[in-house]
């Protein structure tokens, strides 16, 4: 560092020597920002213009920046991955900027070199400040591992579990409660016509439904005795035993007679006597060819025409129609040559 300062003082004087002295005095990372602030101000106060800066002065400034970036890179690696991804990227950008400053240090223009150095110093200081803040925030949070408490384990053993022990009596009462909705499995007619809201919780006792009609009919055909209270009569004896005196005697009524069961569809017996059937009307007598016609029919039909049978002669039909209309003179007869035409033959 002393060698760079002496070479800078021999090669240039005035403003350049002051800048080299300030850069040599900054041997730590904390004074890098102040160095970047002094370089542009010193360059701008020289006789109203900017003088060229030697290569040795730029090399001194770049060497300080490079050392600062390398220190930040080592500091980022020492964090062992906590904020390594953040500070490592910024340190690499600062190191790349320093290489850009080294490549541009051979130029004759001092303004470009000062601008690159200023940006490099600012980037490296921001990276160092953010890395320290990340370390402080991570150290403030205590690292507590996950612990499984006994309160969160409902399926554990009874000594460690805090779940309430189920009561068997309450569970059975809940499963068989009357207010639980379910399908109505009762069959047969209901004794109560009330709705489900007014029905008692216990329900009503339903009678047993009778045997199916097909089963009762098959039992009666087989000759088996019917059950008490059935609607079918007792089976009759066969026809071969009807000639015996025992079969001719009427059957004695049973001692215990059950009341007859009626259904809503069956008609009720009436106490009024049944009406006699109305006899059918007698058909009119059939006339024979020798039977004379009644006088009324003979007065209505004129002479020579029969209402039941048409004659094949056309003049006869015309006379009959004229007589019915009341015409006094009969129609003129056809000539003999016109007799037996196709129309007359079709009427036959």
From Swiss-Prot:
UniProt entry keywords in alphabetical sequence: Transposable element
Q: Where is this region: Disordered?
A: 132-348
PROSITE patterns, per database record: PROKAR_LIPOPROTEIN
Q: Where is the composition biased (Low complexity)?
A: 161-178, 227-273, 288-310
Where composition is biased (Pro residues), the residues are 274-287
Compositionally biased intervals (Polar residues): 192-207
Q: Is the keyword Methyltransferase in the record? A: no
Q: What is this protein identified as? A: Uncharacterized 35.5 kDa protein in transposon Tn4556
Q: Which organism is it from?
A: Streptomyces fradiae
């Amino acid at each position: 560092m002393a060698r760079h300062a002496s070479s800078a003082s021999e090669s240039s004087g005035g403003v350049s020597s002051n800048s080299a002295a300030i850069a040599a005095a900054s041997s730590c990372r904390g004074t890098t920002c102040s160095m970047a602030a002094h370089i542009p101000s010193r360059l701008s106060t020289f006789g109203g213009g900017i003088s060229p800066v030697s290569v040795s002065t730029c090399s001194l400034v770049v060497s300080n920046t490079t050392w600062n970036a390398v220190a930040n890179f080592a500091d980022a690696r020492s964090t062992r991955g906590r904020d390594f991804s953040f500070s490592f990227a910024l340190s690499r950008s600062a190191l790349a900027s320093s290489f850009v400053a080294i490549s541009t240090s051979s130029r004759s223009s001092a303004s470009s070199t000062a601008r690159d150095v200023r940006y490099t110093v600012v980037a490296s200081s921001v990276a160092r400040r953010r890395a320290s803040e990340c370390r402080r925030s991570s150290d403030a949070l205590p690292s507590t591992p996950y612990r499984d408490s006994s309160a969160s384990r409902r399926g554990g053993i009874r000594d460690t579990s805090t779940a309430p022990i189920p009561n068997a009596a309450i569970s059975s009462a809940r499963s068989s409660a009357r207010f639980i909705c379910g399908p109505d499995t009762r069959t047969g007619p209901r004794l109560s016509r009330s709705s489900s809201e007014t029905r008692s919780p216990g329900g009503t006792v339903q009678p047993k439904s009778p045997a199916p009609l097909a089963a009762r009919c098959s039992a009666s055909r087989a000759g088996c005795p019917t059950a008490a209270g059935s609607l079918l009569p007792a089976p009759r004896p066969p026809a071969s035993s009807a000639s015996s005196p025992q079969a001719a005697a009427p059957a004695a009524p049973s001692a215990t007679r059950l009341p007859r069961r009626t259904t809503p569809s069956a008609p009720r017996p009436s106490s009024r006597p049944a009406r006699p059937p109305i006899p059918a009307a007698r058909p009119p007598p059939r006339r024979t060819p020798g039977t004379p016609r009644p006088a009324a029919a003979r007065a209505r039909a004129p002479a020579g025409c029969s209402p039941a049978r048409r004659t094949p002669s056309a003049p006869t039909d015309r006379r009959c129609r004229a007589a019915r209309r009341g015409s006094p003179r009969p129609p003129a007869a056809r000539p003999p040559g016109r007799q037996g035409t196709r129309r007359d033959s079709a009427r036959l």
